[in-house]
């Protein structure tokens, strides 16, 4: 950013995404003045490949999202030298952002998420929350296949994919098709071929399909979706961006509010799981508004 007072913003992708998801929004967050905004709203934008994904160094064991959160906090503070930072993410990025908020609130000053894979250890409390959980569990029956495979026997799948570009493409594209708000029901009306292929090729050329899938195994080792039993509400100011075709349906606000210190809650008319690609301008606008206006004095 050309903003002399710019603040660092850590953007975190998930699976089966990559850093390529953010290519359309990085310039708008770093240089809003080039898109009709103000130079003083620009961020230093940091977009790492998660450990085991893409262009990050190879890992030799499964790492869960909590461990990755600690690694990334060290990366921001020790390696890059920032005193504090904001974080944004969807999918695994949202999970990691939550753990960063819990473990590193001294340094993380704001969270923006567009997905909620995390769960409160005490579960739902009221009838509305219980109804959501019942529906969520039913809806996930048809989604659990890939997740169970990657969380229990990821290497078996990896041997099939490591030398099969078509297999890798099929495994990934099925998610982009099923988790997105497709215009006219067609994937290429929502994503360009370049966007889809760039993401797939990152997995192929870096030979990271196997290690990227280990994060599911790592989460199982860390205890699963839920925070620990001694969990205390995350104090970091948090923005929630809800897109209607998100494959992980959002719980009621009352449930989310027991996890996060919600300062912004927005529901948008269009978009799905891959918000940075599907609705980049909406996502950018919400990020800029939250961090630069709602958290102006932080």
Task: Tell me the role of every PLM-derived stretch.
Residues 6-14:
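Short beta-strand element of the alpha/beta-hydrolase
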Residues 15-27:
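The serine-hydrolase catalytic nucleophile loop
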Residues 16, 51-54, 118, 272:
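Alpha/beta-hydrolase active-site loop signature
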Residues 28, 32-35, 79-133:
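Conserved hydrolase catalytic core segment
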Residues 29-42, 225-229:
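Short mixed-charge
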Residues 37, 46, 50-63, 98:
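Glycine-rich "HGGG/HGxG" loop immediately N-terminal to the catalytic nucleophile
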Residues 60-79:
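Alpha/beta-hydrolase active-site loop
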Residues 150-298:
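C-terminal subdomain of alpha/beta-hydrolase-fold enzymes, centered on the catalytic histidine
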């Amino acid at each position: 950013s050309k903003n002399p007072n710019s603040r660092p913003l850590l953007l975190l992708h998930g699976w089966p995404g990559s850093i390529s998801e953010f290519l359309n929004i990085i310039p708008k967050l770093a240089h809003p003045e080039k898109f009709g905004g103000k130079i003083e709203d620009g961020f230093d934008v940091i977009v790492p490949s998660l450990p085991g994904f893409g262009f990050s160094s190879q890992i030799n064991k499964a790492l869960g999202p909590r461990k990755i959160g600690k690694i990334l906090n060290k990366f921001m503070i020790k390696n890059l030298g920032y005193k504090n930072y904001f974080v944004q993410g969807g999918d695994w990025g949202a999970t990691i952002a939550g753990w960063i908020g819990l473990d590193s609130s001294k340094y993380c000053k704001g969270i923006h998420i567009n997905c909620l894979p995390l769960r409160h250890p005490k579960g739902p409390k009221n009838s509305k929350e219980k109804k959501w959980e019942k529906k969520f569990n039913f809806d996930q029956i048809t989604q659990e296949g890939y997740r169970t495979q990657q969380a229990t026997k990821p290497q078996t799948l990896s041997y099939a994919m490591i030398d099969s570009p078509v297999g890798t493409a099929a495994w990934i594209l099925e998610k982009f098709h099923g988790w997105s708000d497709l215009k006219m029901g067609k994937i290429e009306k929502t994503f360009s071929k370049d966007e889809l292929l760039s993401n797939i090729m990152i997995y192929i050329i870096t030979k990271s399909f196997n290690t990227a899938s280990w994060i599911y195994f790592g989460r199982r080792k860390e205890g699963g979706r839920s925070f620990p039993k001694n969990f205390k509400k995350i104090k970091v100011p948090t923005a929630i961006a809800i897109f209607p075709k998100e494959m992980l349906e959002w719980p009621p606000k009352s449930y989310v509010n027991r996890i996060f210190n919600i300062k912004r809650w927005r529901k948008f008319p269009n978009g799905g799981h891959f918000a940075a690609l599907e609705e980049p301008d909406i996502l950018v606008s919400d990020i800029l508004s939250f961090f630069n206006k709602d958290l102006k004095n932080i």
